């Protein structure tokens, strides 16, 4: 079932004048999202831990003639809330009103039974896939609320709705992502113009 009318396509200026931050923008789905947003007119802020890969995506966007993106090297295994707050302060100091935040960065971790999952792997997966989502959204919320109709988009997985053996911490993190999305959407629904999906 599709909610998009047959034949509909977004215009190349659909996101003109919008600023969208994409985590995990250095490859895969995050790269595709960043490229698509840029091709529809958005200024994209590319966030990831591998600056060389982010630069490659930056170059692709510039070569397409899209608005010049920004690069934000940030390792989401970092647990220090001050780092996320500093990023928000830097963006605020640059007068950025954030129209979109796409949480795409994710770590798969070990594909083994939960009883055999190492605590280090568990911690890394939950940190990147959920705690960093919380910390980054929390820090950036004032910038999102400064935009007239901002949106927070979280990437989930089928194993975040129905657990499967050997998907371990990844599945648990995606269940947490789904729950976080629902709670945040409910909290903001009556008090803010920020949408959460």
Spans of features found by a protein language model:
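Conserved glycine-rich cofactor-binding loop
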Residues: 26-27
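Conserved glycine-rich Rossmann-like NAD(P)H-binding loop of the short-chain dehydrogenase/reductase
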Residues: 42-56
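Rossmann-fold cofactor-recognition segment
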Residues: 64-79
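Substrate-binding pocket helix/loop in short-chain dehydrogenase/reductase
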Residues: 112-114, 121-126
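Active-site helix of classical SDR
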Residues: 137, 173
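Alpha-helical segment proximal to the catalytic Tyr-Lys
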Residues: 142, 186-190
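Residue(s) in the substrate-gating loop at a strand-loop-helix junction
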Residues: 157
């Amino acid at each position: 079932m599709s909610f998009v009318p047959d034949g509909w396509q977004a215009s190349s200026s659909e996101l003109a004048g919008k600023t969208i931050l994409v985590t995990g923008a250095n490859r895969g789905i995050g790269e595709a999202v960043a490229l698509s947003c840029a091709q529809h007119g958005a200024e994209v802020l590319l966030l990831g831990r591998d600056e060389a890969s982010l630069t490659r995506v930056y170059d692709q966007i510039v070569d397409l003639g899209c608005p010049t993106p920004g690069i934000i090297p940030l390792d989401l295994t970092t647990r220090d809330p001050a780092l996320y707050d500093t990023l928000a302060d830097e963006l605020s100091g640059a007068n950025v009103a954030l129209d979109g935040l796409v949480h795409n960065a994710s770590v798969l971790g070990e594909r083994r039974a939960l009883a055999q999952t190492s605590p280090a792997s568990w911690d890394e997966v939950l940190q990147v896939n959920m705690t960093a989502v919380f910390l980054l959204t929390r820090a950036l919320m004032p910038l999102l609320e400064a935009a007239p109709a901002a949106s927070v988009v979280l990437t989930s997985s089928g194993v975040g709705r129905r657990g499967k053996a050997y998907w371990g911490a990844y599945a648990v993190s995606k269940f947490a992502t789904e729950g976080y999305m629902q709670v945040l959407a409910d909290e903001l629904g009556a008090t803010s113009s920020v949408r959460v999906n």
